[in-house]
Design a protein with these regions (language model features):
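Catalytic metal-binding/acid-base residues of hydrolase active sites
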Residues: 5, 14-15, 29-30, 50-52, ...
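Substrate-binding clefts and catalytic carboxylate motifs of secreted carbohydrate-active enzymes
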Residues: 35-130
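Hydrophobic faces of well-ordered beta-strands that scaffold small-molecule active sites
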Residues: 9-11, 24-26, 44-47, 99
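Generic structural signal for secondary-structure transition and capping sites
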Residues: 8, 29, 92-95
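Short secondary-structure transition/capping segments
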Residues: 22-24, 110-111
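Active-site neighborhood of glycoside hydrolase catalytic domains
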Residues: 1-23, 41, 82
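Alpha-helical scaffolding within the catalytic cores
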Residues: 13, 26-40
Length: 130
């Protein structure tokens, strides 16, 4: 805050909330997506959600994986779209922001919108992502 007081502070993204900073930040992969009202009036952000795993053979870095499985890009896309609609519906309830996990696959997590080598879009049209 000393360096740039104009930037909001998320003091502990997704970890135990110490009631500090400007954002009430949660990571939510398992529970129903809801907006929590912060007693201090901080902005509520779901700073990680999603995690739908979809391995594309030939475009992974390891054999192991972690996530919530969609077997094919054909099953990945509808699950992703449903999740996006659920997030959109939370804006009117006070959701200030949301961060999908994640843009591209990483080592043991094949839950990106793009594969590890970033050559395969997992069935989502560019205008849908935008």
């Amino acid at each position: 805050r000393q360096e740039d007081p104009s930037r909001p502070v998320d003091h502990a993204s997704g970890w135990f909330d110490q009631k500090a900073g400007d954002i009430c930040s949660v990571h939510n992969y398992f529970r129903d997506l809801v907006v929590e009202k912060d007693p201090a009036g901080r902005a509520f952000v779901i700073s990680e959600y999603g995690g739908i795993t979809c391995r594309v053979p030939g475009h992974v870095s390891t054999e192991g994986t972690y996530g919530y499985h969609a077997e094919t890009t054909e099953t990945f896309a509808p699950r992703f779209h449903a999740l996006m609609e659920e997030i959109r519906s939370l804006r009117e309830k006070g959701l200030a922001g949301a961060v999908y996990t994640q843009v591209s696959d990483i080592e043991e997590e094949d839950n990106g919108l793009l594969t590890y080598d970033r050559t395969v879009n997992k069935g989502l049209l560019t205008d849908t992502i935008n």
